[in-house]
Swiss-Prot record:
Cysteines joined through disulfide linkages: none
Location of the protein in the cell: Cytoplasm
Reactions listed under catalytic activity: tRNA(Gly) + glycine + ATP = glycyl-tRNA(Gly) + AMP + diphosphate
One GO term (biological process): glycyl-tRNA aminoacylation
Species in which this protein is naturally found: Cronobacter sakazakii (strain ATCC BAA-894)
Gene behind the chain: glyS
ATP-binding found in the keyword field: yes
Protein name: Glycine--tRNA ligase beta subunit
Highest taxon listed in the record's lineage: Bacteria
Length: 689
């Protein structure tokens, strides 16, 4: 069977830069799924994406589906005909579905009876016939939150479509997709190369677009070129470019023909905190800042033009003129803000609402101040520094700089605190109170900063849950999931001796009578334990390991983590499967027991050697393991408990638990309860699969 190359390119107006990669990857995944579902054999499916196009190229595509044999069994012959031999309605309906008459059906004879049978050799459809609908289906499934209409048509897509190219080798596949008739015409760069040209063969893509259209359609190649050229440009001026992947992706999605250029700004602006300058360059202008070998910001930036200019100096000058007013604004705000101390902004916090039922930002500040001090006392941090940082935590929100450049909240608080002569502990805490801001972000570096960061997040969790506005589905307007995970990460990774129960109770207490949800403490703790589940699943832990630990509802995050690691290690032991099964058996036996058990196992009632040996082992283990449990050394404890496998196996093989003698029966059930209690000190091992 001959193999072909298939090309589809959708030419559009400028696509959303932050969605370009996901659109292209989804297009490829959707189309690959269509090929596989249709049974069309194929090679690599390559995707291409530029600001004004999405494209796929399929190598080694089969010319058609393989032929296949179809068999459809019908009703039994006894039910297919009446006494006079006329076909029944069931038989006629089945035959119609197969496209035949009843008398054309074959007979299938087995030892269980005789049935009507339809057999046919179905020729596979050609790729030419199948591909246009596959493209339409793949496009219809793209993750587009908001569709557009254009012109007089009812067609909808992420952006207006101008060209559709469908080529199977050198053949145009006739189709109307997104309201556009397919052709072999593709468009080049807006200002360079040929604005429009024809492509003769699918194999010419994307090289023909590069040579004639001045468009680098290969997204990853374009990104690599920008990165390489930017690194070289920065090195040329003795620096390193800040090529954060998110900005690099966005810039890659904005240009078809990247030309990297270097510009500069006045050195006087370096007196402004680097974070504010970087925010302006990256956030507003999509420029890459440049740092010197000492890590300090240089008075230069790198940007990417979408055109090769005969006079690049003119483009550079234009970008320098654009950024200067923004940097001048930052300088003005910085100088103006420093005329007041941070704490001078406290009264203005009373004018800003945190949440209608929960009060103002000043109310929140007072709670954070108190909770920060309480947490500091629990974790050994400086209480005075923590309460001071809590008091000042939201003051920078009232400054000109943060009002204009919102992403500088926290970091500007740090700079203004240093200017005011606050301790470094307090200043750093103001910056780090929002950490971690996202998955994988750094954690607060000091105990004082940890206290304030936890206090801020716990205040929000307690307040929002306290008025019954917990997250529902995908809606989480107060980012409570992120806040909960942030608290857990700080406590676990910093190994802080905090308990979620008492922490939540303290956060709730500080709200006084404002909260209406009587179950707020339990709701918050359960929510945070649920975030533990998601976190550990992402870390690769099995669901049953997580469930085994959650069964004990441990509310100290550091303790929870130790239990997770212990159970995960326990599962690698040879004895794990047998002991998990034994725990499950014990759990079932105890669940069915209706008689009250003894407080302790009575040695005098033990009859059989296996139960005597198990009772002795359990007693020895209880004494041996108490120090390990007390110190949270759960992994060592489970390794010790693994030694119970043989006496447990022997007990179940040779001892009848439900003996006729009530005293003996209750004593044996008591022994099993003591055995299970040892494992439950760590987790419910019976839940392991």
């Amino acid at each position: 069977m001959s193999e072909k190359t298939f090309l589809v390119e959708i030419g559009t107006e400028e696509l959303p830069p932050k969605a370009l990669r996901s659109l292209a990857e989804s297009f490829a995944a959707n189309f690959t799924a269509e090929l596989d579902a249709a049974g069309l054999a194929h090679g690599v499916v390559s995707w291409f994406a530029a600001p004004r196009r999405l494209a796929l190229k399929v190598a080694n595509l089969a010319a058609s589906q393989p032929d296949r044999e179809v068999e459809k069994r019908g009703p039994a012959v006894s039910a297919a005909f009446d006494a006079e031999g006329n076909p029944s309605k069931a038989a006629e309906g089945w035959a119609r579905g197969c496209g035949i008459t009843v008398d054309q059906a074959e007979r299938l004879v087995t030892d269980k009876g005789e049935w009507l049978m339809y057999r046919a050799h179905v020729k596979g459809e050609s790729a030419q016939a199948l591909l246009p609908n596959m493209v339409s289906t793949a496009l219809s499934k793209l993750p587009i939150p908001k569709l557009m209409r254009w012109g007089a048509s009812d067609v909808q897509f992420v952006r207006p479509v101008h060209t559709v190219t469908l080529l199977l080798d050198d053949e145009v596949l006739p189709a109307t997709i997104l309201g556009i008739q397919s052709d072999r015409v593709i468009r080049g760069h807006r200002f360079m190369g040929e604005p429009e040209f024809t492509i003769d063969h699918a194999d010419q893509y994307p090289q023909i677009l590069l040579e004639r259209g001045k468009v680098i359609a290969d997204y990853n190649a374009r990104k690599a070129k920008i990165q390489q050229d930017a690194e070289a440009a920065a090195a040329k001026i003795g620096g390193n470019a800040d090529l954060s992947d998110s900005l690099l992706e966005e810039v890659t999605s904005l240009v078809e023909w990247p030309v990297v250029l270097t510009a500069k700004f006045e050195e006087k602006f370096l007196a402004v905190p680097a974070e504010a300058l970087v925010y302006t360059m990256k956030g507003d202008q999509k420029y890459f800042p440049v740092y010197g070998t000492d890590g300090k910001l240089l008075p230069n930036f790198i940007f990417v033009a979408n055109i090769e200019s005969k006079d690049p100096r003119q483009i550079i000058s234009g970008n320098e003129k654009v950024v200067r007013p923004r940097l001048a604004d930052a300088e003005f705000f910085f100088n103006t803000d420093r005329k007041k101390r941070l704490e001078d902004h406290l009264p203005r916090l009373e004018t800003v609402l945190f949440q209608q039922q929960l009060g103002t930002l000043r109310d929140k500040t007072d709670r954070i101040q108190a909770l920060s001090g309480w947490i500091a006392s629990q974790i050994g941090a400086d209480v005075n520094h923590a309460t001071r940082a809590g008091l000042l935590s939201k003051c920078d929100l009232m400054t000109n700089m943060v009002f204009e450049f919102t992403d500088t909240q926290g970091v500007m608080g740090m700079h203004y605190a240093r200017h005011d002569g606050e301790s470094e502990d307090v200043a750093v805490a103001l910056n780090e109170q929002y950490m971690p801001r996202f998955a994988g972000d750094a954690l607060p570096s000091s105990l004082v900063a940890c206290a304030v960061a936890i206090a801020d997040k716990m205040d929000t969790l307690a307040g929002i849950f306290g008025i019954g506005q917990h997250p529902k589905g995908d809606k989480d307007p107060f980012a409570l999931r992120r806040a909960a995970l942030g608290v857990l990460r700080i406590i676990v990774e910093k190994n802080l001796p905090l308990d979620l129960q008492t922490l939540t109770e303290e956060a709730v207490r500080l709200y006084g009578s404002k909260l209406t949800n009587a179950k707020v403490v339990d709701d918050v703790v359960d929510f945070m334990l649920g975030r533990f589940r998601a976190w550990y699943q992402d870390e690769g832990y099995s669901v049953d390991t997580i469930q085994a630990v959650l069964a004990n509802r441990p509310t100290r995050p550091a303790d929870f983590d130790a239990r997770m690691k212990a159970v995960s290690h326990f599962r690698t032991l040879d004895e794990a499967v047998a002991l998990a099964a034994a725990n499950k058996r014990v759990s079932n036996i105890l669940a069915k027991a209706t008689e009250p058990l003894n407080d302790e196992v009575h040695a005098s009632v033990l009859k059989e050697d296996p139960e005597i040996r198990l009772a002795l082992q359990v007693a020895v283990m209880r004494d041996k393991l108490q120090p390990l449990f007390a110190e949270g050394r759960y992994q060592e404890a489970l390794v010790e408990l693994a030694q119970l496998r043989e006496p447990v196996d022997e007990f179940f093989e040779k001892v009848m638990v439900n003996a006729d003698d009530a005293q003996v029966r209750i004593n044996r059930l008591t022994l099993l309860s003591k055995l299970r209690a040892l494992f439950l000190q760590v987790a419910d091992i019976s839940l392991l699969q």
